[in-house]
Amino acid sequence: MPRVYIGRLSYNVREKDIQRFFSGYGRLLEIDLKNGYGFVEFEDSRDADDAVYELNSKELCGERVIVEHARGPRRDRDGYSYGSRSGGGGYSSRRTSGRDKYGPPVRTEYRLIVENLSSRCSWQDLKDFMRQAGEVTYADAHKERTNEGVIEFRSYSDMKRALDKLDGTEINGRNIRLIEDKPRTSHRRSYSGSRSRSRSRRRSRSRSRRSSRSRSRSISKSRSRSRSRSKGRSRSRSKGRKSRSKSKSKPKSDRGSHSHSRSRSKDKYGKSRSRSRSRSPKENGKGDIKSKSRSRSQSRSHSPLPAPPSKARSMSPPPKRASRSRSRSRSRSRSSSRD
C-alpha cells in the first residue's frame, strides 16, 4: 500500500487534524503519528500521488508541513492504525514495545552522528524520522552520551541524502546536527564492538609496522657497524702490510747481496731470523770497517777478512782476533825499537 510521509508537524497535532487535512484525497487505511512527523497510508496509489502534489508545503496547525512519498519499508509498530475492530471504522490505537520485528539490526559503514538530540526522542523516533531519506538499518539514541544518537543507512546515497536534507531540521523542539562518521578518521566514541575490533586491528597493524621498522633499522645499523668494522680491519691490515713491506725494504739496502739472497728464502722462522740477520750485518759492518782501517795502518797481512756469518754469535770473534794481532804487532815494534 502507498504510504505518505508528513514532516514538520506541530506537536499539538492529532489524528482528527490529519484526517481533516487529507479529506477529499481518498480513503485512509492507517495514520501513524510520531513526534514532529508521521505517516499516512492510502488505499489507492493515485490518491497518494494527488495528496503529495496538492498538500506539500501547506499549513497544518500553524506549521508548513512536508508531504512526500515514504521511502522506507512499512512498519507495524508505534502507530495508530485504522481497523475493523472498533466496529465504527474509527481509528484505534495499537502500540508495540521493543525493536521492529524484522530481526536484529544490520550494521553498516554509512553512519551519521546526531547531535543536539532531545532527551524525549527515543531511538525508534529517530529511526522513523530518518526513514524519509532512505532505508535505515540501525539507530540508537543517548547510549554513550545524552542528547546524541547514531543512525546508519543501507547505502551511501541514502546517508548523503539525509545529510543534505535533514541536517538542521527540528525534532521535539531541537534542531539536530548531522555529522558523517567516516571509518578512516577515528572518532572519539565507539558505538559498536565491530568498530572497537577495527581499532584494535589498526593498532596491532601499526605496532607490527613499528616493530618491523625498528627491526629493519637495527639490522641496517648492525650491517653498517659490521661494514665499518670490516673497513677498519681492512685498513689496519693494509697499514700493517705497508709497514711490513717498508721494514723489509730497508734491510735490503743495508744488507747488500747477502741479505737479498737470505730474505728470499721463506720458512716458518723467517721473521725472527730476518731480524737477527738485519741486526748482525750492521754490527759486522762496523767491526769490519774498524778492523780493516786498523789492520791496514799496522799490518796488512795479519787482518783476515771475516766471512759473512750465519748467526749473531759468530760476529763476536773477529774483533778479538784483531786485538790479538794488534798486541803482537805492538810487541814486535817495541822489541825492535829497544834493539
UniProtKB/Swiss-Prot annotation:
Quaternary data: Binds SREK1/SFRS12. Interacts with DYRK1A.
GO function terms (MF aspect): mRNA binding; pre-mRNA binding; RNA binding
Name recorded for this polypeptide: Serine/arginine-rich splicing factor 6
Residues that bear N6-acetyllysine: K165
Residue ranges with Basic residues bias: 185-250, 321-339
GO cellular component assignments: cytoplasm; nuclear speck; nucleus
Record keywords: Acetylation, Isopeptide bond, mRNA processing, mRNA splicing, Nucleus, Phosphoprotein, Repeat, Repressor, RNA-binding, Ubl conjugation
Processing and modification events after translation: Extensively phosphorylated on serine residues in the RS domain. Phosphorylated by DYRK1A, probably in the RS domain. Phosphorylation by DYRK1A modulates alternative splice site selection and inhibits the expression of MAPT/Tau exon 10.
Biased composition (Basic and acidic residues): 280-291
RRM domain boundaries: 2-72, 110-183
Family that this chain belongs to: Belongs to the splicing factor SR family.
One BP annotation, GO: regulation of wound healing
Pfam families in the cross-refs: RRM_1
InterPro entries: Nucleotide-bd_a/b_plait_sf, RBD_domain_sf, RRM2_SRSF4/6, RRM_dom, RRT5_SRSF_SR
